């Protein structure tokens, strides 16, 4: 770390923290006091926003894939993000940012996502038909695959480049916006951006935390007879917060790494168990067919606006999912930036888009197809239970059918708790980093700040549980907070393109690659000016050499 970084004053932006909490407390009070009115307003707002912004959201997600893969395969993909060797092993690195990007509700959607699409299918298919069932898992693969992770990559690369290559101080969105537009991160625009980010994190975490708490307490009640009440759910949420606190105090290097390894290993082993002791042949066959259906219909799924119909599926699922991923994108970008020093742009893009997609396809392929098989053979009527009793009841019944069912239910609960703690750790880090001014490369917000924000992040989900808000209301919390970030990510991307052209447009591909090797060996720690001068000298040497040989 250079002297300039060491002398930077680190402090908490109290105005930003207090303002964001004020908004949160008002929202919580509204949900608690005016529950039914809030639910009705949320339903109206969701209908309007998803109808108006369908086309822009679909185009944004589709173009994100084109841009990120184009960047990865270009010469700019060889640019190294920071000097020296990577701080984390490749496996730990991938585990950590995958967990920052997917919530513990993945275990909920992993068993039930297909059932929603079976009841209300896309591509104008008849509801609850053989065709709807055929495409149900394919659509789940689509919503958890390339487009989603490309959105994360698009938001992450610009922040990584600003922080590690351009050496812009401050690990927050406002710092990037300041570097691109000139608006001060501590000014009105900068604070508005960070305020929207903080509120976005509260909205994004709501669905994950609520679905996890509801599923956990239902299965726990089946196993132990403990009443499945509001207080039980609150106790579970607070218990997870304590686990998160332990992770925060241990630190990023030990706490988050350990949690991420525990979760990923636990989920993979659990999926392998279901694959081996469940309907193995059906799971493999339907997973392969679903992947093929997704691949052959990818463009149709990406751009399906349903102008001849009511567009309900696109609004309620594809647009919702893309906005949910967008709502998490800024937080994921902050976390990915923190753990990606020493990686190349291509490595970050491929690890996120390919690694993240394949990981979720495996999990969803196993869990969903086990659920589909149970439905087809009459063991568990998942769609009916989902509609009448709730998805958490269906998951409990599905788990109980496995060999050593009760043991598997306990293991599932353990994985779910650690999964949520790891996810909250990542989100808490992003939020506390945003409220901490002056962070330079390699510096982290204090454990106390991360713990404080973790507790605050539980307020909105607890209010949702108290008001018995339906899934659509929780979706609205995500959608409303996510929309502005399409514009912010586009501004980040504009800045990234501008910086790449300024810094590397005239630098040959082999010199960019060579610089990465040199930095890894020497461990250079250059400022922007030193970096630019070095590039100019190498370019001049290359031109002279070409002239001599010609």
Curated annotation (Swiss-Prot):
Protein family (similarity comment): Belongs to the BCCT transporter (TC 2.A.15) family.
Compartment(s) of residence: Cell inner membrane
Keyword Cell inner membrane attached: yes
Regulation affecting activity: Inhibited by the protonophore 3,3',4',5-tetrachlorosalicylanilide (TCS). Not activated by osmolarity.
Organism: Acinetobacter baumannii (strain ATCC 19606 / DSM 30007 / JCM 6841 / CCUG 19606 / CIP 70.34 / NBRC 109757 / NCIMB 12457 / NCTC 12156 / 81)
Main localization category: membrane
Phenotype of null mutants: Deletion of the gene abolishes growth on carnitine as sole carbon and energy source, but does not affect growth on acetate.
Protein name stated in the entry: Carnitine transporter
Molecular function GO labels: transmembrane transporter activity
Superkingdom field: Bacteria
NCBIfam families, per the entry: bcct (TIGR00842), PRK09950.1 (NF007412)
């Amino acid at each position: 770390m250079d002297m300039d970084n060491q002398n930077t004053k680190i402090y908490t932006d109290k105005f930003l923290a207090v303002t964001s909490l004020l908004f949160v407390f008002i929202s919580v009070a509204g949900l608690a006091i005016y529950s039914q009115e809030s639910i009705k307003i949320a339903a109206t707002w969701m209908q309007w926003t998803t109808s108006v912004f369908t086309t822009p959201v679909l185009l944004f997600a589709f173009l994100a894939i084109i841009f990120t893969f184009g960047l990865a395969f270009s010469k700019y993909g060889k640019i190294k993000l920071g000097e020296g060797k990577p701080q984390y092993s490749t496996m730990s690195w991938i585990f950590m940012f995958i967990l920052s990007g997917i919530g513990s509700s993945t275990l909920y959607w992993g068993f039930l996502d297909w059932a929603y699409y079976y009841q209300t299918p896309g591509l104008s298919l008849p509801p609850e038909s053989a065709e709807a069932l055929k495409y149900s898992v394919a659509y789940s693969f689509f919503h958890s695959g390339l487009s989603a992770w490309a959105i994360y990559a698009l938001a992450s690369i610009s922040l990584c480049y600003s922080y590690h290559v351009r050496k812009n101080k401050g690990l927050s969105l406002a710092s990037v916006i300041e570097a691109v537009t000139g608006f001060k991160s501590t000014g009105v625009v900068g604070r508005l951006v960070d305020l929207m980010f903080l509120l976005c994190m509260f909205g994004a975490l709501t669905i994950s935390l609520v679905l996890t708490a509801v599923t956990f307490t239902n299965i726990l009640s089946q196993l132990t007879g403990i009443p499945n009440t509001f207080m039980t759910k609150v106790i579970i949420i607070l218990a997870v917060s304590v686990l998160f606190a332990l992770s925060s105090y241990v630190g990023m290097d030990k706490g988050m790494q350990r949690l991420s390894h525990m979760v990923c290993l636990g989920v993979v082993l659990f999926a392998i168990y279901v694959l081996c002791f469940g309907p193995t042949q059906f799971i493999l066959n339907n997973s392969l067919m679903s992947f093929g259906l997704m691949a052959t219909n990818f463009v149709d799924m990406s751009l399906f606006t349903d102008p001849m119909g009511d567009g309900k599926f696109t609004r309620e699922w594809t647009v919702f999912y893309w906005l949910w991923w967008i709502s998490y994108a800024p937080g994921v970008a902050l976390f990915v930036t923190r753990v990606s020093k020493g990686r190349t742009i291509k490595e970050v893009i491929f690890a996120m888009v390919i690694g993240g997609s394949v990981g979720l396809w495996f999990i969803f392929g196993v869990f969903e197809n086990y659920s589909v098989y149970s439905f087809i053979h009459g063991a568990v009527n998942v769609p009916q239970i989902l509609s009448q009793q709730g998805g958490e009841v269906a998951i409990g019944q599905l788990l109980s059918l496995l060999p050593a069912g009760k043991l598997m239910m306990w293991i599932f609960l353990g994985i779910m708790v650690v999964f949520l703690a790891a996810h909250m750790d990542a989100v808490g880090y992003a939020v506390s980093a945003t409220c901490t001014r002056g962070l330079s490369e390699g510096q982290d917000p204090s454990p106390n700040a991360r713990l404080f924000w973790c507790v605050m992040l539980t307020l909105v989900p607890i209010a949702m549980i108290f008001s018995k808000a339906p899934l659509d209301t929780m979706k609205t919390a995500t959608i409303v907070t996510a929309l502005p970030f399409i514009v912010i990510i586009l501004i980040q991307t504009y800045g990234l393109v501008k910086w790449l052209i300024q810094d590397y447009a005239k630098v040959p591909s082999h010199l960019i690659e060579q610089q990465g090797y040199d930095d890894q060996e020497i461990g250079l720690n250059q400022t922007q000016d030193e970096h630019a001068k070095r590039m100019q000298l190498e370019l001049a040497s290359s031109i002279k050499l070409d002239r001599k040989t010609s």
